[in-house]
């Protein structure tokens, strides 16, 4: 999809986050306190990213997952804003999803910290 098509498909906030690597305000997203069973998908291309059983409450204000579907998420070094982080993007379309940190649950020690507006949801 080109920029014009994306701007028609996405809300201004979804575009800012997924295409310009923005971050939504903590505790503002619709999936922060979302607990339905199903699949979280990329808002841009629809690729399945995170099963609902991998979601946990990290207390950070953003939807957090301890693992992604294998091959669904790419990890990219991010040194913006003077920080050393790892950006996560949709491996299909390159949409910015958030960041992954090594402070998650005991099983994986990963916290995929995502922006709600970069996600969609398909219930089981």
Pin down the residues of each PLM region.
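A short Gly-Trp-Pro
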Residues: 1-124
């Amino acid at each position: 999809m080109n920029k014009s098509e994306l701007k028609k498909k996405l809300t201004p906030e979804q575009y800012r986050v997924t295409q310009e690597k923005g971050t939504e305000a903590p505790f503002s997203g619709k999936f922060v306190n979302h607990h339905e069973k199903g699949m979280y998908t990329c808002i841009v291309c629809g690729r399945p990213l995170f099963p609902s059983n991998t979601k946990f409450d990290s207390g950070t204000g953003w939807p957090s997952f301890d693992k992604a579907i294998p091959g669904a998420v790419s990890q990219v070094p991010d040194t913006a804003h003077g920080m050393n982080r790892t950006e996560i993007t949709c491996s299909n379309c390159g949409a910015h999803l958030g960041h992954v940190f090594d402070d998650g649950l005991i099983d994986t020690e990963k916290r995929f910290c995502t922006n709600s507006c970069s996600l969609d949801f398909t219930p089981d």
